[in-house]
């Protein structure tokens, strides 16, 4: 879902 992608993106940006 988009929420899952959003979470993954935030992890990658850390």
From Swiss-Prot:
Egg-yolk protein that is a source of nutrients during embryonic development. This is Lipovitellin-1. It comes from Schizocosa malitiosa (Wolf spider). The lineage of its organism: Eukaryota, Metazoa, Ecdysozoa, Arthropoda, Chelicerata.
């Amino acid at each position: 879902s988009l929420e899952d992608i959003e979470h993954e993106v935030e992890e990658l940006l850390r």
